A protein has these predicted regions:
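Surface-exposed assembly/interface segments
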Residues: 1-360
Length: 360
């Protein structure tokens, strides 16, 4: 069953299902699903109960320790501390041929591709080749109707040079990808590289309602490993980097953006997650209530349109989006077993910049 996969008018899909084309406004849905699941592959799980090649759902840090061992559970704990509802853990099989690490990542991507989750993150540092492979995987999944965010990070060396972190953001440019470029200092003084803190950010994104932004969210840490000047922060933002800043006695996320950003426009995590929710919920509702169950005639089409519109109006009422519109397509004829519906809405963002003119 297709689940919001892309469609092409010159090569229509064969399988029954709902297919979505995003034209800078998007396909939509009908019943909000759980959005707080973070997926993480764990490569070392000695001392725990995990079995190689198996998936596990964790909702408590103590269960994570039991599963993968105390020494390996930090990524799971950080995801939950960030606010995720659940952690989908995959016990990655050990390499049969040590030199063939690329196959290990390809295989784990294939394993995760058929699981349900909202945000993906690695437990620690990966190399540039795997980053590129993961970016391609995110895009491939999106084209097949699987929508999730990927949170990336770097090692301590790249955290010490914002130019390097920004270059990674540019290389990972995608509306579904977030790149953390700031290492952090925990409350106990421990320095943590951005790749190791990325699980906390993944949990924060997953646990934040889709009508809220993570911009200026305060983090439970003491400092960052590299404080940036204003000009450096601005350059990082236009490069698509997620930056953490020391703001007086607080440490905050500067702006909740994706790597799909430039000098004039920032891709927002909030609007991307709203789009993903719509693209995920609509196919589920269509599959459960409409596909194969209504006639392709005016009354059946009207029922489908009304359901889609009602869902979007619910999101509008929750300040997720504005101005939803649903109608039969005027460009394609709905006949046989095919229905073409145009859905549009306006993104709703948070107030993030306030400009004052003070006269005295």
């Amino acid at each position: 069953m297709a689940n919001g996969a892309k469609w092409d008018a010159t090569n229509l899909p064969i399988r029954p299902g709902l297919y979505a084309n995003f034209v800078k406004a998007a396909g939509k849905a009908v019943l909000g699903g759980a959005r707080g699941i973070v997926a993480v592959p764990i490569f070392t799980y000695d001392g725990g109960k995990a079995v190689s090649g198996k998936f596990y759902t964790i909702d408590a840090a103590s269960d994570g320790i039991d599963l993968v061992g105390n020494a390996n559970a930090t990524p799971i704990t950080r995801i939950l501390e960030g606010g995720a509802k659940e952690v989908l853990v995959y016990a990655v099989p050990a390499l049969v041929i040590p030199e063939d690490s690329s196959k290990q990542f390809i295989d784990l991507h294939e394993a995760f591709a058929v699981q349900d989750f909202n945000v993906f993150v690695y437990p620690t540092v990966i190399d540039d080749t795997v980053q590129a492979t993961t970016k391609a995987w995110v895009s491939e999944c999106r084209n097949e109707g699987k929508h999730f965010m990927y949170v990336a990070g770097g090692d301590a060396e790249s955290d010490a040079d914002i130019v390097t972190g920004n270059a990674r953001s540019v290389a990972l440019k995608d509306e579904y990808i977030v790149n953390l470029v700031t290492g952090v200092v925990l409350l106990d003084g421990t320095e943590v590289q951005s790749a190791d803190y990325a699980p906390h950010i993944a949990g924060l994104i997953a646990g934040t309602p889709i009508n809220k932004s993570i911009t200026y969210v305060e983090l439970p840490i003491a400092d960052v490993t590299l404080r940036l000047k204003n000009s450096q922060i601005e350059k990082a933002l236009t490069s698509g980097s997620l930056v953490i800043v020391k703001d007086g006695n607080k440490v905050r996320i500067e702006q909740g953006i994706t790597t799909d950003s430039n000098a004039t426009e920032r891709g927002k995590i909030r609007t991307t997650r709203a789009k993903q929710a719509v693209a995920t919920d609509l196919p589920a509702a269509a599959r459960d209530n409409y596909i194969g169950k209504i006639d392709n005639e005016p009354n059946g089409q009207a029922a489908l349109i009304a359901a889609f519109k009602a869902y979007l109006e619910t999101l509008e009422g929750e300040n997720v989006l504005t101005d939803p519109r649903v109608a039969l397509s005027s460009n394609f004829k709905s006949e046989g077993d095919k229905v073409f519906i145009d859905v549009s809405y306006e993104d709703l963002d948070s107030v993030e910049r306030i400009f004052l003119t003070i006269t005295h």
